[in-house]
């Protein structure tokens, strides 16, 4: 994102998703000092004496510069500072066809608006003090959320709960810094620093930081999810497992080996974790060129998945083909599903002892899915109890908080070494700077560019 783009420009963009499956409504958004003038140039209210009032919808028509009508629409003006960007904002609510929405946007540009860059509306909201940086990042997280838990976590961030926690820590550190600096400036007028009490407050701040850091791993998991590939030799029930797990008939199931020749994908949520579930072609040697391509693709996919689910047939037991597949993936996070246990018991099969996660199943009947989901959660969380998150740190925020922690550890070492108070202030300021990077009070243009460039246009 180009942060040198003039903030005085009035910007415009399509604010709703542009997808092949057209929605019923499409919104074009304007922000800037000329937003209202541009809207008035291309939108005529149906009622002749209608007055543009802030936060009131107007019904009318969008037209081109020659007065030719383009769409029947609604318009709403949000007068600064009572808008998302704290600038004048106008939204034009059109019918959802892409041609209509694009034509409306083009009229805005012809009247002098500049096409907004990705994230520029949210950047202006941040620069104008409407939101802090944690809230801006939560906007992107809310748009990208793939599970109810991720959406709730992003919403809490958007409401400012993470920013409030960070600012509270900052205020406490500022209080500690003020006590030291007062004694540096007015040493003769103040009693000596109560070091044990001061240190206890510092330890409390460190504990609060650690509690926030504990949310980062789970938060990242809820945001990004995991890719799970179902692998195994042909006809062991991989497609039946995908269908049972996803609750949909996504894959063709037959008694013929080699039916699945391409990767079949399904999206689901497992205990709050977004999962991209992939059913792959059965891995075996084959003379069929089409099936061989599917096998090769399955092998490549197995190397990129976060978790592999290896399916075997309880009737056949642990075969040489199973052992060969396992040998190629044994270094990866793995769950073994022993399928068709209604036909043969799983406990009679001799399996490699190092496979920790084993799930008996009858995929065709949907049996074993809860146990499989429990194994997946245990595997990706490494068995650690997972907090019920209200807010969580993303990777950037966690890195900054670790930097703040490291600075406070330097303060502790300075205290233990009985260094002068001046040395304490250096690292306290370092911790304050790191916390300011989280909320955006102290942030570089390069970091802002990195953050807002991942937004979609119109946000």
From Swiss-Prot:
It is found in: Cytoplasm. The gene is mnmE. This is tRNA modification GTPase MnmE. Residues 225-381 form the TrmE-type G domain. Homodimer. Heterotetramer of two MnmE and two MnmG subunits. The lineage of its organism: Bacteria, Bacillati, Cyanobacteriota, Cyanophyceae, Synechococcales. GO terms for cellular component: cytosol. Pfam families: MMR_HSR1, MnmE_helical, TrmE_N. (6S)-5-formyl-5,6,7,8-tetrahydrofolate binds at residues 29, 91, 130, 459. Its EC number is 3.6.-.-. GO terms for biological process: tRNA methylation; tRNA wobble uridine modification. Gene3D superfamilies: P-loop containing nucleotide triphosphate hydrolases (3.40.50.300), Probable tRNA modification gtpase trme, domain 1 (3.30.1360.120), tRNA modification GTPase MnmE domain 2 (1.20.120.430). Belongs to the TRAFAC class TrmE-Era-EngA-EngB-Septin-like GTPase superfamily. TrmE GTPase family. PANTHER family: TRNA MODIFICATION GTPASE GTPBP3 (PTHR42714), TRNA MODIFICATION GTPASE GTPBP3, MITOCHONDRIAL (PTHR42714:SF2). Mg(2+) binds at residues 239, 260. K(+) binds at residues 235, 254, 256, 259. GTP binds at residues 235-240, 254-260, 279-282. Exhibits a very high intrinsic GTPase hydrolysis rate. Involved in the addition of a carboxymethylaminomethyl (cmnm) group at the wobble position (U34) of certain tRNAs, forming tRNA-cmnm(5)s(2)U34.
